């Protein structure tokens, strides 16, 4: 908030309409943004500092896009903070915009995963009844 002058609203788990899935961003910003904060080790933080604006670390793309899907937000500020770094390098903010093509693929993958979970649950119930 101090760096960007954006007020952040805390939020809990947000369920995606019609699915047993959702996300829990670290905060919501205004009507259009959300927030994801990481506090990594120095080496990892340095890698994040090298990312171009608009890019998130590959390992967090699905999480960030999923948060925008769940919240309906247009962008997410990916924030990395490491207090051990020199002043001026402690905070890294990369604004990532919503990618509906990625979210559509994520939707397909989540629905497929939930179908697998449902099938496992049915199989386990049948096994329990047969025992």
Regions found by a protein language model. Give the residues of each.
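Accessory terminal regions of nucleic-acid processing enzymes
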Residues: 1-131
